[in-house]
Curated annotation (Swiss-Prot):
SMART domains: HTH_LUXR, REC. Residues 3-119 form the Response regulatory domain. InterPro entries: CheY-like_superfamily, Sig_transdc_resp-reg_C-effctor, Sig_transdc_resp-reg_receiver, Tscrpt_reg_LuxR_C, WalR-like. The modification 4-aspartylphosphate is found at residue 54. One of its GO terms (cellular component) is cytoplasm. CDD domains: LuxR_C_like, REC_NarL-like. This is Transcriptional regulatory protein LiaR. It comes from Bacillus subtilis (strain 168). The lineage of its organism: Bacteria, Bacillati, Bacillota, Bacilli, Bacillales.
Length: 211
């Protein structure tokens, strides 16, 4: 049986969820909490397999409750079940440790399936939320600094260039041939989008890559 804890400040929501879930052959509701602080206490006390978490509640909200539960328990499986898909709700609770994010407009069977998936460590995201997360990942990639694409070896060579080392000195320090050094430098210049080693050195200092 999958042991589930419900955390929601609306009694009717908890009653409806509990009635549906208890009718499932493989799911058991082991506790209900009406706010975040009570939810944290019950989560620690009962160690449920899966937690259904509302976000907007009086007192401690779902984001803070998720943070605290993730600090107290090892790898808790938290499914957010809410009416909100605002950025200031979605990202903080996922970053806090929530595994899945569903809307209260989801079909009952979808919630049950998400619970079963969560018990195996498999996430389920409402399609609009998945779109938001993917968009954010794409944008974070677009905003990445050029040197973040350098390999460890290329970063080493960039730092040595910034220290004023010649190709020969770099090769001797890293035990590689001058030809290999030149190949790495060509790649470095391309990735940093600079035209020569002087500009590469300036970039390294500007981005605090060398002391």
């Amino acid at each position: 049986m999958i042991r589930v804890l419900l955390i929601d400040d609306h009694e009717m929501v908890r009653m409806g969820l509990a009635a549906f879930l208890e009718a499932q052959p493989d799911i058991e509701v082991i506790g209900e909490a009406s706010d975040g602080s009570e939810g944290v206490r019950l989560a620690v006390e009962l160690s449920p397999d899966v937690i259904l978490m509302d976000l907007v509640m009086e007192g401690m909200d779902g984001i803070e409750a998720t943070k605290q539960i993730c600090r107290e328990l090892s790898d808790p499986k938290i499914i957010v079940l809410t009416s909100f898909i605002d950025d200031d709700k979605v990202y903080p609770v996922i970053e806090a440790g929530a595994l899945s994010y569903l809307l209260k407009t989801s079909k009952a069977a979808e919630i049950a399936d998400a619970i079963r998936a969560a018990s195996k460590g498999e996430p389920k995201l409402e399609s609009k939320v998945a779109g938001k997360v993917l968009s954010r990942l794409r944008h974070s990639g677009e905003n990445a600094l050029p040197h973040e694409s350098l390999t460890k070896r290329e970063l080493e060579i960039l730092c040595l260039i910034a220290e004023g080392k010649t190709n020969k000195e770099i090769g001797e320090e890293l035990f590689i041939t001058i030809k290999t050094v030149k190949t790495h430098i060509t790649n470095i210049l391309s990735k940093l989008d600079v035209s020569d080693r002087t500009q590469a050195a300036v970039y390294a200092h500007r981005n605090h890559l060398v002391n």
